[in-house]
Amino acid sequence: MDPAKATPMFAQYLQIKEQYPDCILFYRLGDFYETFMDDAELVARELELVLTGRDAGKDMGRVPMAGIPYHAAEAYIARLIEKGYKVAICDQLEDPKKAKGLVKRDVTRVVTPGTLVEPRLLPEKANNFLAAIAWSRTGFGLAVVDLSTGEFAAAQMNGADSLRLLLEEIGRLEPREVILEPGLAAEPSVTGPLKASGIAVSVFEGRHFNHANAYRKLTEHFGTANLSGFGCEDLELATSAAGAALAYLEEMHKASLGHVSGLAVYYPGDYMVLDPATRRNLELTRSLRDGGRRGTLLWVMDRTVTAMGARLLKSWLERPLLDLRQIHARHEAVGELVHRPVLRADLRALLQEVHDLERLAGRVAVGSANARDLVALKQSLVALPSIRVALEDVRAERLVELRDQLDMLDDVRDLIEHAIADEPPVALTEGGILKDGFHPEVDELRRIARDGKAWIAQVEARERERTGIKSLKIGYNKVFGYYLAVTKPNLPLVPPDYIRKQTLANEERFITPELKELEEKVLHAAERVMDLEYELFVEIRQRVAAEVTRIQRSARAVAELDALASFAEVASLYGYCRPLVDGSTVLELKGSRHPVLERVMEEGAFVPNDLLVDTGENRVLLITGPNMGGKSTVMRQAALAVILAQAGSFVPAESAHIGLVDRVFTRVGASDDLATGRSTFMVEMTEVANILHSATERSLVVLDEVGRGTATFDGLSIAWAITEHIHQAIGCRTLFATHYHELCELEGILPGVKNYSVAVMEKGEDIIFLRKLVRGGADRSYGIQVGRLAGLPASVVERAREILATLEEQEGERKSRREAAAQRLRRQPAVQLTFFEPKKDPVVEELLGLNVMALTPIEALNTLYQLQAKAKENR
């Protein structure tokens, strides 16, 4: 559209909209935010609003229009953000009453999923991260920032595994929005997983990712000469991502970012790695059933009483520690709180008085805090001295450090207490924000506005008496303010100093100089007091904002105290033990329980288990037994015990010795990946391949029914080969549940492989699951009995028994032939030796040189025929 042909107002709209083509523009017009043209049609559709129209100017006709009341905008914006849109807020920059000509307007903020600060738009117990990704041929840089709390962190991933590491971090952090430079935004390997996870992807100009520009942006923001103090001086990609994230926030929020006061550089290798499959399979924070919290590890462990503590505890569970000193420090703190129940109860009661200090500080810093936010901040600060007193005699080193980090912030608390009303209104333009006695001019203007009605009543009474007009009344309208109303019969009594302003059918309206002077005082006072209160409030907010760094320091201490107290509360309630975590490669649990299942089962119904796995004689535990017998539960509870211990928590067991684990891998269950066209088996093999490529000797691998997604012998072969590879090439602690009883033969072949099973008691045709892990493999799977328990029709169960009997008879014959062949092989020493130490056989050499994963099924079959022919020739 041509702005030259538009009305002045609409020309202004078009000019501003042109600068924000990817946003819905909310254009302030009086008491409404209006949208026009395509934006209006979109908003009307998405928010179910009535679509109207407005004249846009000569030759332009009426354009679609849809509006929302400005005081209710937050709720509407939230709905649009949830649907993946960005909203640009265009406000009036001057009072329309005082404007000469067209009111000045401009965008004061762009609301995107990753730049939210409003409490109603944010998840209370989770961070709202914006992420930025920088890239080069050598790797990736990742920065995340939570504008609502001021948290800012960056990491760099280099080498062949950099993309995998990047996506693992993205999966852990779950940012609401990711910004990419145009080149990276065209890479499906990056954008595909992001969009599949429901993360909003925004393209940001490449110049912001330029290292020199990013470096300058960061040093200017932090007021430093270089970045060596943040540990990223030599991390170009991390620096580029961090600078771009900061530039994006400045461009979107257009406000101070003083609360983003530091940059925490970290290395993914400093923490236990939990890939997306492991987090999903172990249900750390999201239930497999419905994606909710109930039934997750977080659901059990989160007994926090502050939103800050809840967010921190969640991050601890998602990123367990590898530093033994930090782990032991948390255990010591939790231990003291466990053994001092009175201290724990007092501390939790006091923490409950603390509001979300992190986000309150964030809103103060960006200038969006209202008077009620400052009151909540004051109430939180009032609790800090009592928290410090409660911790006066603690002995645990970490508790002492946290106590000493608590800044009482007396000056901030006293300022708010002295200035802000105890129950102020939400809106900052309605008055009533400041306390009486805080500012003399405010007090005087309030007195005038408050007493104005009494003054009017006095004038009315006096004029009735002076004129003798008993029906005389003083009224008010917006056209000419206060007036004296005189009915027609009383007009002869009107004195000469009355000035006629309006004649109506039954009365005439007059004004007097005295009345106009009074009107000026009363109306000006009401308007002036609201303006003055707002100005003073902004000054107070700025004074508080200057102390945001101190508030954040106390907020972090409160959050950690809350998280530690939560761990202690859970440990005390449910009988957890303090684990011994050291540098060994032992994982020994006595009386171990599943933290989630024991909470959803009846009291005392869960069966504890012992487990020992290490990198020596108990390297691989092969666990067999029926479905529903408890194989998966035993393995998962072992993995969860490791995660809890290294997160700093006690664990659900009688005792626990846990050698440090660098990664926990789980391959549990699978389904087709329809989005990428991958079958269940392909998904399973991809996850297993990731484990085999990434696991180290210090990893814990949990495999459940690997190989069941293909033909029996294919699956058995793959499971066997995987077990051998883990045992010989990796040597890590491994728990492998399987239905392939043939794998039990590995105990006699590979040292360190041990057979275990979940005990079952047979009672006639029924079975009772004892859910106890015992030494030795299972000889049966009890599949038919499980089917019967599941409610299969009796005829199906009986037919299954008949088929099973036939198959077992045939398998018995095949087994006899295999055993006879094995006996013949055992009588041929040379052949037996070649099984373990192959000679230089050309067929074997060719086999060893094959890239099996690169062969198609047809190529594999042809190769097999050729090798068989060569083998026959060499006999």
UniProtKB/Swiss-Prot annotation:
InterPro entries in alphabetical order: DNA_mismatch_repair_MutS, DNA_mismatch_repair_MutS-lik_N, DNA_mismatch_repair_MutS/MSH, DNA_mismatch_repair_MutS_C, DNA_mismatch_repair_MutS_clamp, DNA_mismatch_repair_MutS_core, DNA_mismatch_repair_MutS_N, DNA_mismatch_repair_MutS_sf
Record key words, sorted: ATP-binding, DNA damage, DNA repair, DNA-binding, Nucleotide-binding
Binding site for ATP: G625, P626, N627, M628, G629, G630, K631, S632
GO cellular component: cytosol
GO terms for biological process, alphabetical: mismatch repair
Family according to the record: Belongs to the DNA mismatch repair MutS family.
Known function: This protein is involved in the repair of mismatches in DNA. It is possible that it carries out the mismatch recognition step. This protein has a weak ATPase activity.
Protein name in UniProt: DNA mismatch repair protein MutS
